[in-house]
A protein has these predicted regions:
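Short loop/turn segments that flank or connect secondary-structure elements
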Residues: 1-272
Length: 272
């Protein structure tokens, strides 16, 4: 079964977003006057999954090893362009004012970067006319037809992995040692544009220096625990915090987060 698509310039996909960025894209976004935030979640990682577990391998490659008390976890850091209302690059006529250097996630839309998220037009913000059969074929049986889209997806996936050591260093630069439990929410760090740009620049320098001095791969760097560093897992649900305490993990409610960190929860807060 095939899906046809053509952008109608409706602007629906350019409002109220958190757009995942590579670190290089984040610096461009900041240069253009936009806001960049750091999202962090933590995945308990007691054992290495089987080699044929593709989904776990995908998560693993985009995260770094850490400890929360005595619980091994993988920290998944995500740098995003954040805006409420229209994108700061959206022009009055609904054209993109940064079209030539827009983020790769924007370039591939409505395709999915994550290979484990099925392509579903119903999950997109595009209006029905965008999917009419008179337009070119966009996707056939889960495969995207356009070679440029394929290339941008591959480059986006590559940067997700290649940026991990620098994102780890970014957490260090911003003093981040708290993350939301995976599938419950995110800890969001909002240091401001100048502070974020300086932190990203320092993180990139630190990661490059570390890689050169240690002569290790990005994968090896992401798998090394930081001695003496323990992450606190944030949850707005008491039952989750109790469960984490049972496995000797460090946990806390969102109120424990320091400024400028915030909690975005996927579930209602519960103290029971």
């Amino acid at each position: 079964m095939s899906t046809h698509f053509s952008c109608t310039m409706c602007g629906h996909c350019c409002h109220d977003l958190r757009i995942p960025l590579s670190l290089a894209e984040a610096r461009v976004w900041l240069r253009d006057g936009g806001d960049v935030q750091l999202f962090c979640e933590a995945l308990p990682w007691l054992d290495e999954p089987p080699a044929d577990d593709g989904y776990a391998a995908y998560k693993r490659a985009r995260s770094f090893a850490a400890m929360s008390g005595t619980l091994p976890v993988r920290i998944v850091p995500m740098v995003v362009a954040a805006f409420d209302g229209p994108c700061p690059n959206l022009l009055p006529d609904l054209r993109c004012g940064a079209y030539d250097h827009r983020p790769r996630v924007c370039r591939i839309y409505p395709a999915e970067v994550n290979p484990f998220v099925p392509f579903a037009p119903s999950a997109k913000g595009c209006p029905p006319p965008a999917w009419e059969s008179r337009y070119p074929v966009f996707e056939i049986g889960g495969r995207y037809v356009d070679e440029t889209v394929q290339a941008d997806i591959a480059l986006r996936r590559h940067s997700d992995v290649a940026d991990v050591p620098a994102k780890r260093a970014l957490c260090d630069e911003l003093g981040v040692r708290m993350a939301a439990l995976g599938n419950e929410g995110f800890v969001i760090v909002k240091p401001g544009s100048e502070a974020m740009d300086a932190a990203i620049a320092a993180a990139l320098d630190a990661a490059n220096a570390s890689m050169q001095n240690a002569a290790q791969s990005a994968l090896q760097a992401a798998d090394a625990f930081e001695p003496g560093v323990s992450w606190t897992l944030i949850s707005n649900r008491q039952a989750t915090r109790d469960a984490l305490a049972c496995v000797d993990a460090l946990s806390a409610p969102p109120a424990a987060l320091p400024v400028p960190q915030h909690y975005l929860g996927f579930h209602p807060a519960s103290e029971a």
